[in-house]
């Protein structure tokens, strides 16, 4: 951000659940911002701040005039904090407005939840990218699903503004319009990609539109000012849930625009590269499971959802040419397998010998600080700690210590696993999402010049682990893991770049992207399993789409017809969004190549002449006169 007279230039950023500001010229923290340079993002959410472990956003937010508008990544467990959208003054750090994504009494949408849900329901957050129409002063929010993702007996109703595209007055935070793309989400179908602002020719008129691509493969396009759909959307019936207390919404909105992913898994669509042993395993597995769009998860059988939690369009996966009405979507055909399991009392998952072992270990090493009933004292509460922390992190804390807690290097794996299960955890739960609830060690000129003092970490408090007293709630809780073990379950192409002409509502072209070494051995027609996760694109006004993909791939496509104009393979895996900038009239493309290649990618870092990890900058060669 910079002031209109260009004298005040600031870098606004989030760190350790805080919002801070740095002078962009000197690199010094601006200590007049917030409370001595620090805004605590755990404050102002109508929850005990000490119970909030994670609130900072995965994305930097968006600037509108003198406001920075922030989303958040509060987690996806039971009792995660709400993902309310907040705007702060970039000069003072003052909170200017809050939009309650889980409505409170008297607010629009409150009646789409149980009356007390705002006290315990969480998420409905923007963890991805917002978009702002600066001329109209409208910010567009792609909101995520409510917690818990896969079982919603404690949130019966449509659950506004979950899974909704919401248009707010960027100055005041007041709602202008909204559209909910999934009612009462039970599948983790967040809106995870940036809404694209473009102008389309529709019914003989030029209309300023906003378009959003979803994780479950649909494209929705609206009038940017009114929220009116430009293409028909039909509410269609879908199966009911067979889970106790659950009421799946009877209909879901289906866009009339062509889908960009498949929506079911069948025996005929299994990966043809599977060895026979795996193919036979899946043929048998599909006989006892169910698959289909909007099929509610169950504890009675496995549901194979396509797309799954990481399918379709995710963050960084959309771009557009606003003047031509063209939108581009990077998508991956990635299924999830779900089976709900009742959360049992900790000791119910353990044998008698394991319970004795855990109690003996706890009494000897943990009781003094964490209390006889695990409710905390000198150290935080451990009640249901296994539901709030992944096993690998838990194991690391036990072995290596944290803060004032020493490490216990003598503890064997069986005892650590039993203790974790005793605390309500499941060691098999995969950690697909990096946690952000630990204090980062900060070095460099900011600290050297007198950085803002880091406040006490939220981990010192006890996270919310049960419903508030007096609130009606289901007797049982159910959970499942993300079911992401088979990224190449379906036949290829596994990842693609899809071009939509939103003037006509058609797909203009589709090209596979990414490189796979496991199944197709580098075949360019298949793409790569999970090929666009944490990848992105840049769309130029001159008709080129630059896109990154799994396997260290960087492409330049003709934006009009999808022809590959140029491609290269980087020495390291790409991460995040590529960017472009212009200096002295020349354009430069910057790509982050700092990642490690997955097991199903070729290790280009080991090849002769490989470049070190870093940012790669490309430009067209100078034309000799």
PLM-predicted stretches and their roles:
Residues 1-352, 417, 421-625:
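Beta-sheet-rich non-transmembrane sensory/scaffold domains
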